[in-house]
Amino acid sequence: GNSLGGEFQVTTYTTEDQAYPSVAALADGGFAVSWSSTYQDGSDYGIFGQRYDSSGDAAGGEFQINTHTSQGQYVSTMSGLADGGFVVIWNSDGQDSSSYGIFGQRYDANGNPTGSEFRANTYTSGIQFNESYVTENVAGLADGGFVVIWHDENGRDSSGSRWSGRGRCGCLGILIE
């Protein structure tokens, strides 16, 4: 395809590093971007985002996605949802009372958080993370829900959880062997 404009800067906060971006297409033709930002939330890394309308213009300002700010939250991935909203998933250090866990936040079509930050992994012993920093994925489903998949280093397996359109976990977890 042809470019619809020039290169643009997503982040407005430019102190330290802003890295590991992810982008999701939204139902209204816009898109949302998330990334990891060093020290912006007072911790090692935090997860931040920005929405854009169908013309590619920023819709509102840059916003913080993670509410838990102890230690670090790293490497987000996101997906657009059937209702026009989106969900962001990331790795969080120490938040699940063990080591790294998989956490997320859902947003409505206007970019407002729906519910609170949630833990996607049900098994919390050890690490649901991988040093490759590409460990979790999320996909929106036609019914408005989503599926989260990650690598569990404890058993070297891939695991996942499915969530309803209301943001409720519909299962105890998925083990992919």
Region locations from a protein language model:
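Extracellular, repeat-based ectodomains that mediate carbohydrate processing or recognition
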Residues: 1-177
